[in-house]
Amino acid sequence: KIDERNFDSLMERLLSEDGIFIVDNGASSFVPLSNYLIENNAIGMLQEAGRDVFIHCVVTGGQALLDTLSGFKALAEQTSTNNIVVWLNEFFGAIEHNGKAFNEMKTYAENASKVRGIVRIAKRNPDTFGRDIEEMASRKMTFGEVIGSSDFSIMAKQRIKTIQKDIFAQLDEVGF
């Protein structure tokens, strides 16, 4: 069990230090961190202190679609920010339910006012792009680290650059 009081030191840093912060938490800490942020009105506190808060939420296709849609819905309903960036990850399948795309779903329609933007990670060839991304992720490398690494072939780097350009262009559209 995660002691949510430990998030206090994170909040201290977010409030006292300058710069851009990215809090990348995994599935095991998602619920405790969400509870902490909501119960303590932490997002409101950060905004009152002049901090811009963006929450990135992943919705993934395939078997986890309904669970990740439920997570998005809960997050949107429980937070006061209108700066949610939804990442639609098609790696495990299309983001589609009962013949409807994400932006046609009731869950999205009811919470669209909370969404700052949507970034789509398109399903690509799993033998090339998929393996390159898996390798990058397993090594916990950034796009720049892969591109500068001698461990990746020229074509693997080209595929990584293609994905990077696509994602960065979509992030530019979100307008941070």
Where are these regions (language model features)?
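Exposed alpha-helical structural elements
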Residues: 6-9, 32, 41-42, 100-104, ...
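Generic structural signal for hydrophobic core residues of well-folded globular domains
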Residues: 14, 59, 171-174
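Conserved catalytic-core segment of NTP-binding enzymes
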Residues: 29-131
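NTP-binding/hydrolysis catalytic cores, primarily Walker-type P-loop NTPases
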Residues: 134-176
